[in-house]
Swiss-Prot record:
The cytochrome bc1 complex contains 11 subunits: 3 respiratory subunits (MT-CYB, CYC1 and UQCRFS1), 2 core proteins (UQCRC1 and UQCRC2) and 6 low-molecular weight proteins (UQCRH/QCR6, UQCRB/QCR7, UQCRQ/QCR8, UQCR10/QCR9, UQCR11/QCR10 and a cleavage product of UQCRFS1). This cytochrome bc1 complex then forms a dimer. It is a multi-pass membrane protein. This is Cytochrome b. Heme 1 (or BL or b562) is low-potential and absorbs at about 562 nm, and heme 2 (or BH or b566) is high-potential and absorbs at about 566 nm. It comes from Paguma larvata (Masked palm civet). CDD domains: cytochrome_b_C, Cytochrome_b_N. The gene is MT-CYB. Heme b b562 binds at residues 83, 182. GO terms for biological process: mitochondrial electron transport, ubiquinol to cytochrome c.
Amino acid sequence: MTNIRKSHPLAKIINESFIDLPAPSNISVWWNFGSLLGICLILQILTGLFLAMHYSSDTVTAFSSVTHICRDVNYGWIIRYMHANGASMFFICLFMHVGRGMYYGSYTFSETWNIGILLLFAVMATAFMGYVLPWGQMSFWGATVITNLLSAIPYIGTNLVEWIWGGFSVDKATLTRFFAFHFILPFIISALAAVHLLFLHETGSNNPSGMTSDSDKIPFHPYYTIKDILGLLILIMALMLLVLFSPDLLGDPDNYTPANPLNTPPHIKPEWYFLFAYAMLRSIPNKLGGVLALILSILILAIIPLLHTSKQRSMMFRPLSQCLFWLLVANLLTLTWIGGQPVEHPFIIIGQLASISYFSILLILMPISGIIENHLLKW
């Protein structure tokens, strides 16, 4: 008799995705982040669901409802901080996952890569709207500044912004719709993640060498399930250290002041995971140019497969490209730091140079290094 996990229609899908899935025998710890992202998504949906039970999406009561969750709801404080810091963990895993894809040439799976870019945009949109919900000073002014960027779109910009706001400023209508979208988007992300996996399982996983691994496959369970559980334990430990010892480490003190449209905070800035893009936005003096830089900083990922000039897929055996990759990482860290600094000398010029080098590395230097490495192969 056939095992039920191989015959039952539903169990068969799970079996072919997580148990009997043939996986390359040499995938490293960098391949752990996909499963960790799945765990983060589940954690965010669960904690978010319990927060939504007590949250009130009205400008008058939103701030006090979050305070009520932390003070009066059983274990409300831990649910709230797990949700807030869970977002940070989500983005750490996301950046690692995208970085892995770039380093090892996983972007050659174009469908999987493009769905991944859609997922990245969806997660960023969700996180932005979630940041508005506590209705603190940074929530209100962050929402005002970021949504106002759409007014840079010629002709329809102003109408578009007022349509999104549901009025002539960020107010009750904006908060209510942001809550609605913040609630629904994670479920859309779940569906996209399933499609992401579907496309990945059409081709099979990449591996560090970038070469085909059809001749050397091992079953996903128990080898990679055990490996993923180790990653999960480290993730949970890091999250709980953050939640229990310094839950406000990554937040902004201004968000503990209720939103006040009459008082602008001295430095308006988003959460840390958006700072690199925010720094690019601020480094261009023109409004429309800044908005384009902001969008292109992520959208540039879509053309990375077209800029692949090397005969080798992975960067494992390409020292020149490796140097450029780590230069890009250092560059992004610099941009993240600059995004959190006030707009004054020397931060302005550092931000501009870092923005130029970000696009230069991706669009010019990496394709050139691929061509140089191809020539070096002939020696």
